[in-house]
Amino acid sequence: MTRQEGLRKPISGCVSCDILAGQRLEPGGVIYEDEYWHVGSVVRPVVWPGFLVVKLKRHCEHLAELTPAEAAALGPVLQVTCQALASVLNPAKVYVCSFGDGVTHIHFWILPRPPGMRPGMHWVMLNLDVRVMLTRLGVKRWLVSDAELVSLAERIRSQIGQRMEG
C-alpha cells in the first residue's frame, strides 16, 4: 500500500477525521460540503465569531499529496467561504492560513479580522490565543454562545448556497 492510499482512511485520534466521521460535533453543523472539502466552525471553545475550518474529507497531511481534483476544488471553496463570511460579518479582512503543526490533517483556518483590530495575522493569532487561554481559565467573556454559532452558521450557509447556485 502506498502512503497516499493509506491516508484515504480515517486516522484514529485525528480531530478532523473524528469530525468528518460524526464523532465530534461542530457548532452550527456543516456549513458547506462538496465531494472533497468540508466547511464548519472551529470546535469548542469558540471564542471568535466566524472562525471557520475548511478540511479535506479524506485524511491527508501534505498539500503536495492532493489529487488534481481535490486541488482544483479547493480554490472555489476557499473563495466562496471567504465571500460569504465577508458578506455576513463585514470584517476588516479575512485571513486564510494553514499550519498543520497540531492537527496534521490538511485544513485551513478562515479567520475574520474585526474592524478596529490592528492589521496583521500576528495580532489576530495573539488575540485568539489570549481569548482561548482566558476562557480555559474560566473567563467566559469571549465565549460565543450556541445560539450565536447556529445563527451565524445559517447565515454563512445561506450566503455560500447563493454563491454556489449563481
Task: Describe the predicted segments one by one.
Residues 1-166:
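HIT superfamily nucleotide-processing domains
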